[in-house]
């Protein structure tokens, strides 16, 4: 006999309902279908189950297609690993197909892209060079980027445009770039697709170079923030903002832009946001997926996966289903 004062409840009189009456949120009509050989990416997409992330992924594909059809903004916010994963050719192809009306980079993404154009390689072995202080000390990267920024401020242009222009001018002087065809900064500049670069002083390696000019860096990135706010106004009613691989800086920049745009009286509602990353972090979730849609309609999606898999898959789905 139990020594506890409490006795187990008797379920004899518990009221039950029929399974038919209860129903269910998951139905066989929502199940996946086996992949059919030769059906391509479009067939694969159609074969996915109609649940959770699969539905979210399809919704992002449809939102991108709708934004292009309605000539609304398609803005790609990206961290450095998107560039380091070798995705520039995929993104540039999407740009040429009308699936990118602007690129929004943090400092890391800009550095890696600039180095790819300059030298055909990027990304240091930090553990190998940090002990003796060589990390971030590349001469050409620091010199060329800082010079471009200073000249851009002098000429009244932002950081993204200044970096793209500098790479273009290097090519015009005799093909000094090793891999210009792989640069977002350069090819977007040539296509007149805006690129904005958003930095925090001290987070990026060019900031420790002797040529770094804090006033110029601040002025250039602030101008780009104002330009980004202008791009955000074009999200209204049908645009889409994708945050890919920036866990803190760009989600904060985006939220401030949304607030500034609305504060200035621009309508901003009924647009789509999506966060792509291999982990779903707090700030992208609240600042990109959730808060911008409070009391304003629209929808936010969180897609979890590695950039080198998810972005080519997204591009392939767009090309096959909405060429």
PLM regions with names:
Residues 197-234, 238-239:
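Conserved mixed alpha/beta catalytic, RNA-binding, or beta-rich assembly cores of soluble enzyme
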């Amino acid at each position: 006999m139990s020594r506890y004062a409490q006795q187990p409840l008797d379920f004899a009189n518990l009221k039950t309902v029929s399974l038919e009456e209860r129903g269910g949120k998951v139905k066989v009509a929502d199940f996946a279908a086996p992949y059919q050989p030769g059906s391509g990416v479009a067939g694969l997409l159609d074969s996915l189950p109609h649940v959770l992330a699969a539905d979210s992924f399809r919704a992002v594909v449809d939102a991108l297609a709708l934004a292009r059809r309605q000539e609304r903004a398609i803005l790609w916010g990206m961290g450095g690993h998107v560039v380091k994963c070798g995705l520039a050719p995929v993104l540039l192809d999407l740009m040429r197909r009308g699936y990118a009306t602007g690129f929004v980079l943090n400092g890391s993404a800009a550095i890696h892209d600039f180095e790819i154009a300059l030298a055909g390689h990027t990304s240091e072995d930090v553990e190998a060079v940090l002990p003796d202080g060589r990390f971030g000390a590349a001469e050409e990267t620091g010199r060329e980027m800082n010079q471009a920024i200073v000249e851009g401020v002098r000429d009244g242009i932002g950081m993204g445009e200044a970096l793209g222009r500098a790479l273009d001018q290097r090519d015009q002087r005799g093909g000094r770039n090793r891999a210009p065809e792989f640069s977002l900064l350069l090819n977007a500049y040539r296509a007149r697709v805006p690129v904005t670069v958003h930095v925090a002083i001290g987070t990026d390696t060019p900031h420790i170079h002797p040529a770094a000019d804090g006033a110029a860096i601040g002025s250039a990135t602030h101008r780009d923030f104002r330009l980004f706010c202008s791009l955000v106004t074009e999200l209204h009613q049908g645009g889409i903002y994708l945050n890919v691989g920036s866990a803190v800086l760009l989600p904060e920049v985006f939220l401030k832009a949304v607030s500034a745009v609305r504060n200035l009286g621009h309508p901003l509602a009924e647009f789509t946001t999506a966060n792509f990353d291999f982990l779903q972090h707090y700030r992208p979730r609240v600042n990109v997926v959730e808060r911008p849609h409070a009391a304003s309609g629209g929808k936010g999606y969180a897609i979890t996966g590695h950039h080198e898999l998810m972005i080519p898959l997204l591009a392939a789905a767009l090309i096959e289903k909405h060429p």
